[in-house]
């Protein structure tokens, strides 16, 4: 569950996209996150445990970090796993994911508060 929702938010909440050439435009949009999680929690409340909810903010941070490491590793290994359009493609992809991770980390207190509010609003016991 954590990997799926974490990857969804990683992908959807970066308005600059995964292939942007402008690292300064990479950010985690907490408003998009709120909209997605509001809908997700309204359906997922029936199967999410208290621990699932507790670790939700951490998975949002973990997934871009993990993908950034995978892109960086592939770059160092000669770009053998991910398809590349140019030699530094995976290196740049890694930088985008690391910048996204940084943005998530900077907003972690707000992200935790957001999830707490959504959980309470949905009436999910946590």
Language model feature labels by segment:
Residues 44-51, 123-126:
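Intrinsically disordered, low-complexity coil segments
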Residues 48-60:
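All-alpha amphipathic helical-bundle segments outside canonical DNA-binding/catalytic cores
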Residues 2-46, 62-81:
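Active-site activation/catalytic loop segments of kinase-like enzymes and analogous catalytic loops
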Residues 41, 57, 86-89:
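Sparse, context-dependent recognition of short Cys/His-centered cofactor- or disulfide-binding micro-motifs
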Residues 66-126:
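ATP/Mg2+ or Mg2+-diphosphate-binding catalytic cores
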């Amino acid at each position: 569950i954590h990997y799926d929702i974490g990857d969804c938010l990683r992908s959807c909440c970066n308005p600059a996209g995964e292939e942007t050439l402008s690292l300064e435009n990479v950010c985690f949009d907490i408003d998009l996150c709120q909209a997605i999680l509001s809908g997700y929690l309204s359906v997922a409340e029936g199967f999410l445990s208290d621990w699932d909810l507790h670790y939700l903010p951490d998975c949002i941070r973990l997934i871009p970090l993990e993908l950034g490491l995978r892109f960086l590793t592939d770059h160092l290994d000669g770009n053998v796993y991910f398809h590349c359009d140019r030699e530094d493609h995976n290196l740049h992809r890694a930088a985008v994911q690391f910048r996204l991770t940084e943005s998530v980390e900077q907003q972690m207190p707000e992200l935790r508060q957001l999830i707490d509010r959504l959980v309470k609003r949905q009436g999910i016991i946590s």
